[in-house]
């Protein structure tokens, strides 16, 4: 059986990195299809592309795009149910897509894959499918994230916050906690991405505008150095299907503060400082501890470097291969 891979998801974002890492290890033929896989018209486009394939073929998508109708064996990755569980990240078309097309495909596809046990259980509950139809393949960390990379040296100490200005990234609470934390005022807070008026206005009102920086779009190759140079990663997200920044920071030897909700405690284990992401006071306390206690930072760094050994792309690819082999075997028997 020939399995075609939907490579259109490749990019610098989370799903894009998963796409590239699996492509390098699985070496599947790329599906002959163009267009944005997240487009509202893509279910039809993907359905038509699959109709053109020979019968003894299958399709694997590393993202959450699915065909209007499943006409060939199909496997895909649902990284999370963000658009269902976080209404501010959804709209009418996304709700229709998830509830009418994606949910049905969870029943019709050979298997749905996901990246954490949290997401797996959430998908099983939402789609109302048997447990065996959703497989947790985990996630990996690229070898470029390591403790011996050259750290970013801006001339001052900083806390690092990887985000995109979406509400579930919880950056307003991070900013408020940072402003209220009793720490060395020379320490700055650095965000990836561009500022928005809401955060800039909040920074001005909290009188920390000069202590907060936005890096704009950060090339992926620069991220390891930014992690490595930071006192800590501050990542108290309200919702994650996995949380790649947590393991990327750990791989660089950087201490992590993250949330005690969704997938994050599962990913971080005991190798991070866990806080209630809805509590500014807990985030503030975590920031104060990380900035004032070098022994805590050292301990979290060591634990993180051990923890991250669990997250290898080779392991993820092996789990995908197992599913592909099972699909081929069942297709032969049919």
Regions found by a protein language model. Name each.
Residues 1-334:
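Carbohydrate transferase catalytic cores enriched for Leloir-type hexosyltransferases
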């Amino acid at each position: 059986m020939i399995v075609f891979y939907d490579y259109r998801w490749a990019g610098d974002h989370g799903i894009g990195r998963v796409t590239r890492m699996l492509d390098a290890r699985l070496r599947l033929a790329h599906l002959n299809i163009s267009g944005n896989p997240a487009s509202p018209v893509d279910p039809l486009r993907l359905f038509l592309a699959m109709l053109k394939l020979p019968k003894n073929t299958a399709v694997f998508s590393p993202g959450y795009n699915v065909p209007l109708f499943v006409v060939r064996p199909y496997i895909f990755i649902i990284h999370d149910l963000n658009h269902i569980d976080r209404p501010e990240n959804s709209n009418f078309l996304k709700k229709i897509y998830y509830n009418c097309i994606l949910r049905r495909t969870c029943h019709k596809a050979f298997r749905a894959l996901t990246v954490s046990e949290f997401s797996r259980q959430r998908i099983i509950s939402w789609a109302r499918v048997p447990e065996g139809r959703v497989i947790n393949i985990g996630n990996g960390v690229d070898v470029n994230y390591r403790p011996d990379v050259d750290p970013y040296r801006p001339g001052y100490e900083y806390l690092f916050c990887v985000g995109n200005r979406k509400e579930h990234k919880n950056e307003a609470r991070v900013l408020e906690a940072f402003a209220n934390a009793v720490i060395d005022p020379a320490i700055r807070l650095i965000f990836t991405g561009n500022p928005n008026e809401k955060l800039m206005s909040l920074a001005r009102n909290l009188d920390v505008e000069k202590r907060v920086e936005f890096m704009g779009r950060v090339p992926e190759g620069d991220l390891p150095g930014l992690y490595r140079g930071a006192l800590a990663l501050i990542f108290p997200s309200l919702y994650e299907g996995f949380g790649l920044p947590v393991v990327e920071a750990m791989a660089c030897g950087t201490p992590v503060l993250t949330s005690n909700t969704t997938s994050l405690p599962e990913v971080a284990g005991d190798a991070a400082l866990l806080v209630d992401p809805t509590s500014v006071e807990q985030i503030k306390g975590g920031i104060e501890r990380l900035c004032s206690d070098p022994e805590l930072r050292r301990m979290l760094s060591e634990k993180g470097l051990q923890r991250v050994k669990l997250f290898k792309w080779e392991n993820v690819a092996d789990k995908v291969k197992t599913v592909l082999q099972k699909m081929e075997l069942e297709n032969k028997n049919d």
